From Swiss-Prot:
Segments of this protein annotated with the region Disordered: 371-390
Comp. bias regions, Polar residues: 371-381
Annotated EC: 2.7.11.21
The protein's name: Serine/threonine-protein kinase PLK4
Record domain Cryptic POLO box 1 (CPB1): where: 390-507
């Protein structure tokens, strides 16, 4: 039996037939072994070409990895040898060619969900086998999936595969097929086994839809779409299919579904009935009827360390045989242990398979090993050395999870957090030629803080300032960095962005808790905390300013040791600990798919609410009592070197009698007009002018005696107060520009009926106050 399965060790022992495919440094031929009379595919690699292009190590690695593998879903490498001119790989012949060509030329339609599930199960089984041996394929695509004579799926082309030392090892090389490459690979971030999971998601989408999810006419535009991870999901796909694709194509590799979980997903259980991988002939017979038997080969391209590597693989069906030696130049036996029989893989001696992942599923962790803490990449031939050597940023990567979109302008930069969580810094310089400020540098940072893109838009001229950041652009791969290798000349930009994110976090509630005495809010920083007592007092705790206590009149209590302050601080400390415990408990309860934050616990006691303040649903400015804030959080002085909050005590102490008089009277509407295409303008008895815009946002202009400035409330209910000497965001500035004409119209409006009993001396003169900038979320 052994003699009938023996493969030749020289090219003369094969009858070489027609060409299947040709690449830059190799050709693939159909051939027949003269000993076993079996059809095979022979890949002939030109030694001179690979030596000239520096790809000798890549060929060595391909042979080293592929020769060890034996699995029903992996194309088998039978043997390899060489002569003076060529390295020869004798491969299993896939009679029915590549899956991509079969779908386009024979099936002439996308696969059904049942067919797609059958293919998916076989691919996942093969990848689990590879991953169980810490082998990352890095180029899973329909062109690299071949069909045997019995229509079984065969994973082929290990030209980009790499052997990891451990499952959580990370590499940095940018390689793969553009339509199937993962965001972390495009961004040159450290990546590992989850990169293959992303490719499986692209594969499944392509099978069911007929085209890749991020396909465009150009490679650069395709890679840009991959980085943004934005694709259209066809509505005709079932819920199970859509759910699985979304889980496979999660932008963050930590959030992607694992291959083990794919096998348990309802999409496979529903369409394949949860049965195990089938090795019986005709596993894909439901779509094989239209197949005309053909031999196939293909040539593909891959970018590896900026070099174009022409790769191809053969296109069937046999069992393995002994692995002969190859010249040390290409396959060092000291590393692989092929110099003697006892050092060869066990399946070569006994004809048995290496343990398949299916045998190990019950003992495998459902999560990717080691992905909670990404290890810094180490130096090897696949990794890009860090330009900064041993120096690293001293701050951890920023993170914008759960932060609302916002845009903030300083003197030299415009900072934004987008709906996707991406942070965008637009650095501004005055251009004399255009007589205006122009955007000269752009820094885009991913939501997890690990991918950074820095470039100059339209160098020399810059871009005009808009209400939103410029569209995403990657001018060249040299503009893309990751957290580990960011050059130190760009560190200040990263620090600037991180402090901006920290500022927004310090104003974004994570836990809202109603205690017996007040409304408590623990911010996303987990250190910033505030309590607004029902009595009107307030306690603020921040990592920069410590604890500040305000009494019911809005005045700062300078002596925190007095009885009044002590009681407020004690209650605040108790509530702070309670909120932290709630947060920790919910962190354990939440999953990748379902977050628990932000969360509101309890509600304000009914006895402490005025009748006019009890309302449900949307904000209705006519149905509750208006109140002017008696105190405001400090104004923000934002710079790259410091973020500080300041507030003068005199702001609270001056006009205190006046404030007390105003506080004694209900703040009710006295005038109201409706302005077409703008909204409803209301004047309150305390002098506040409010504009409720039709888009759901609201601007309140507060008179100087009340503290001055404006309060801007977004459509989602998030309020920001702007005070003295600060710039306004564009959205607020546009609305403020309309205020003078609205106030003029309001002056001509008659008083409302319920306003005639209000004492006239309590109404603030209608003067246009300057509009300044202070955040008080």
């Amino acid at each position: 039996m052994m003699s009938t399965r023996t493969f030749g060790e020289t090219i003369e022992e094969y009858e070489v037939q027609h060409l299947l495919g040709k690449g830059g440094f190799a050709s693939v031929y159909k051939a027949r072994c003269l000993h076993s009379h079996q059809d095979v595919a022979i890949k002939m690699i030109d030694k001179k070409l690979i030596q000239g292009t520096g790809l000798t190590s890549r060929v060595r690695q391909e042979v080293e990895i592929h020769s060890r593998l034996k699995h029903p879903s992996v194309l088998q490498l039978y043997t390899f040898f060489q002569d003076v001119n060529y390295v020869y790989l004798v491969l299993e012949l896939a009679h029915n060619g590549e899956l991509q060509r079969y779908m386009k030329q024979h099936l002439l339609r996308p696969f059904t969900e049942s067919e797609g599930a059958t293919i998916l199960r076989q691919v996942v089984a093969g990848l689990l086998y590879l991953h169980s041996h810490n082998i990352m394929h890095r180029d899973i695509s329909l062109s690299n999936l071949l069909l045997s004579k019995e229509m079984h799926i065969k994973i082929a082309d290990f030209g980009l595969a790499t052997q990891l030392k451990r499952p959580d090892e990370r590499h940095m090389t940018m390689c793969g097929t553009p339509n199937y490459i993962s965001p972390e690979v495009v961004s040159r971030l450290s990546h590992g086994l989850p990169a293959d999971v992303w490719s499986v998601g692209c594969m499944l989408y392509t099978l069911l839809v007929g085209r890749p999810p991020f396909e465009t006419e150009g490679v650069e535009s395709t890679l840009n779409k991959v980085v943004m991870s934005e694709f259209m999901m066809p509505s005709h796909l079932s819920f199970e299919a859509q759910d699985l694709i979304h889980k496979l194509l999660k932008k963050s590799p930590h959030e992607r579904i694992t291959l083990e979980q794919v096998l348990r997903h309802p999409f496979l259980k529903r369409t394949v009935g949860g049965s195990s991988y089938s090795t019986t002939p005709g596993a894909l017979n439901e779509f094989s009827q239209s197949l005309a038997s053909s031999d196939s080969g293909i040539v593909t391209f891959a970018s590896s360390d900026s070099r174009k590597s022409h790769r191809l693989r053969s296109v069937d069906n046999s069992s393995g045989q002994s692995m002969p030696q190859i010249m040390e130049e290409y396959l060092p036996s000291s590393n692989l242990g092929y110099d003697s029989k006892e050092h060869r893989p066990i399946y070569e001696q006994h004809g048995s398979y290496l343990p398949t992942p299916g045998d190990q599923l019950e003992n495998r962790d459902a999560k990717w090993p080691g992905t909670n803490n990404l290890a810094p990449f180490t130096s090897d031939s696949d990794m890009i050395p860090s330009p900064v050597g041993e120096k690293r940023l001293l701050m951890p990567p920023l993170e914008t999870k759960r932060l609302q979109p916002t845009r903030y302008k300083t003197k030299n930069a415009i900072m934004s957090i987008l709906r996707t969580g991406e942070v965008v810094l637009e650095f501004v310089k005055f251009k004399v030629k255009y007589n205006e400020d122009r955007i000269t540098d752009i820094c885009r940072i991913s939501e997890d803080g690990r991918r950074i893109i820095i470039y100059q838009p339209d160098p020399g001229r810059g871009l005009p300032i808009r209400e939103h950041p410029p569209d995403p652009l990657i001018p060249s791969e040299n503009c893309v960095y990751n957290y580990e290798n960011l050059p130190n000349k760009h560190w200040k930009k990263y620090v600037y962005a991180a402090r901006f994110v920290g500022l927004v976090k310090s104003k974004t509630p994570k836990i809202t808790f109603f205690s017996s005495l007040g409304k408590c809010q623990l911010m996303e920083t987990m250190t910033d905390f505030e309590v607004r007592f029902y009595s009107g007092a307030k306690l603020l705790k921040s990592s920069t300013d410590g604890v500040k206590v305000f009494n019911s009149n809005g005045a700062v209590l300078s002596d925190n040791g007095c009885a009044e302050a002590r009681n407020l601080i004690d209650h605040g400390n108790e509530c702070f600990s309670h909120c932290v415990n709630i947060s920790n408990a919910l962190e354990l309860a939440q999953t990748k798919e379902n977050t628990c934050f932000p969360v509101t616990i309890g509600r304000r006691p009914a006895a402490d609410m005025h009748a006019g303040q009890r309302f449900d649903g949307l904000r209705d400015t006519t149905n509750f009592a208006y109140s002017t804030p008696k105190s405001n959080q400090g104004s923000i002085n934002f710079s790259v070197s410091t973020i500080s909050t300041t507030r003068s005590a005199s702001d609270y102490n001056s006009n205190t009698p006046r404030l007390n008089m105003l506080a004694a009277h209900q703040n009710v509407p006295i005038k109201r007009i409706t302005v077409p295409e703008i909204g409803i303008v209301t004047e309150l008895s305390h002098g506040v002018v409010q504009v409720q815009f039709y888009d759901g946002s609201m601007v309140s202009v507060i008179p100087k005696v009340q503290g001055g400035g404006i309060t801007y409330t977004q459509a989602n209910g998030l309020s920001t107060h702007f005070g003295n000497n600060d710039d306004l965001p564009f959205a607020v500035r546009d609305r403020i520009n309309q205020m003078p004409q609205l106030q003029m119209k309001l002056k001509c409006a008659p008083l409302l009926g319920n306003a005639r009993s209000v004492d006239c001396h309590l109404m603030t003169p209608k003067t246009t106050t300057p509009f300044y900038n202070r955040m008080i979320i």
